[in-house]
């Protein structure tokens, strides 16, 4: 990402813990720092927020949630997952996942405002900037 050792990693929705660990380890051994894109979509992760935290701590993978999920989780499980990780300080970045201006618009400002209300202001700023730049 941007000439750094960070690499955005998107996995399958039904990926197993072992396969996710193997992918992260392979990238780490190659000298990269994996940033796991929207872990709130991966069934194994969303079913066990505590295990996701353990996964993050053990593998060194960073977690990037979608701004849409922060603003309006699609279901109880996404809400529980997102709130738990934010409370634990285990989210490393928030990104828009914008594909166009109509169906998936950039909503980082709204996500940032939500984060400043529901988390620490410094943490909110850290989440919407990555390497000193707005995500």
Model-derived features with residue positions:
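Mid-to-C-terminal alpha-helical segments outside catalytic/metal-binding sites
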Residues: 108-135
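Short acidic/histidine-rich active-site segments
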Residues: 90-106
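Structured loop/turn residues at beta-strand edges in well-structured enzyme cores
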Residues: 2, 88-89
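Charged helix-capping and loop-helix junction motifs
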Residues: 21-24, 47-54, 76-86, 108-111
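Active-site environment of divalent metal-dependent phosphoester hydrolases
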Residues: 16, 41-45, 70-73, 99-103
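Extended substrate/RNA-proximal surfaces in nucleic-acid metabolism proteins
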Residues: 1-59, 63
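Active-site neighborhood of phospho(di)ester-bond hydrolases with catalytic His/Asp-centered motifs
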Residues: 35-37, 64-67, 93-96
